[in-house]
Each structure stands twice: as C-alpha cells, then as structure tokens.
Amino acid sequence: EGLDFVHNLLGGRCSRMVADSSEGDVVAFLAWKGRLDEMQDLAEECCDRLAAAGLDGWLILGQNLATTADVRRGYLTMCACQADALRIWPGRRWFSLEQMAFTAACREILEKGEAETQQRLAVLPWLREGTETDLFGTLCVYYLDAGSSLSKTAEQLYVHKNTVKYRIQQVEQRLGYRVDQQPEAIELYTACALVRLLGETTLGQSDNALPDTSDFTP
C-alpha cells in the first residue's frame, strides 16, 4: 500500500524514479531537479496525504548519494536513528539524512559514558543558576522545534515574542556569545538534543544541577 502511494504521488513529479519496499520501509530514488523549497513543499504534501490515507510513517530526505555504499550507509543510519530523532524533534514529520547523522553522533556521545555526556552538558548550570526563568527550555524550543524563529518559539510556548527575545538575550548575556554564532551554537544545539535524548522533560526547572546520567544506559 505504501509503495503504491509513493508511485502515485511521486511518479509524475520527476523525470525518473525507482522505488521499492524493504523491511517495511519504502525507498525511492528520484531524478529531481527542482528547487529546495519545492522539495520541502513536496515532503509536506506527502506527509499530509499519508495522514489523510490513514498511513503512519515519516519521510527521510537525502541528496548527493554518489555510490551504493553511500546509499547503504544512509539507509542503515536512518533505520538505527528514527526513534532517537523523534525524541530530539518530537512531532516532526520528515527529516534530512544530515539530521539522522547528527542524531547518530548524539547517541555516540551518550554511549561514551557519563564523563563525556556531562562535559557536553556543562553549559546547563550557567543557564539555570540564579533564575526561575526557563532559559534552557526556551533555547531547546528555539533550536529544535521552531527553526531558530522567535515568533514560532513564542507560539509554541504561548508567550509574547518579546518574552522569547528577552530570554534569548539573557542566554547570550550569560554565555558571552550569540546563540546563532558559529561554532559556539553547535555545542548549544548538541546540548539541547542530548537533554531530550536523556528524557529530561522538565527543561525549565531552576535548579543548577546537570541531568543525572549515572544510571543512564544507552
């Protein structure tokens, strides 16, 4: 059923397509020359039609896979990381292979043990100490749920956009750099993802302790 769905939806959207099913997944290779925004719109449309048809599933989009080894590596990463990706970006309906690779890298950090994990989360106390404001939780939503958009973050947190802007400014004041500054933002983004993988749901708690990773089994 899923394979027929993909053929019907994508068959007329590209010059060539090869699709088949493997272990419950549908894999499609497209000769696609459209723009990035067109591909993203197509992904959203595919998700909408999946939901309308009563089919469960997520999309993984990958480009620039030059060899069969690249395809195999990407597919195995996708299979291994789907559950973790949904914990990092809950509610998301489609992912890129780059997001799946990032998810795999986060899992590798956790598997290295408590010391490595705590080092990657060392930023947390600086955002929690001396405040009851949910600075780190706001940052998680800003990065992982709202695509670094102040207005979308405000919508998700049910607060005014200026409130989010103030909180982000407080984060930057405490850390000494802008949250969109590279490479610093990479560490912040990773810390947000790790906290979600560790299952800490109360991100706004004002204590200055790091998440307890001593009993965590990857």
Predicted segments — roles?
Residues 1-218:
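Cytosolic nucleotide-utilizing catalytic cores of signal-transduction proteins
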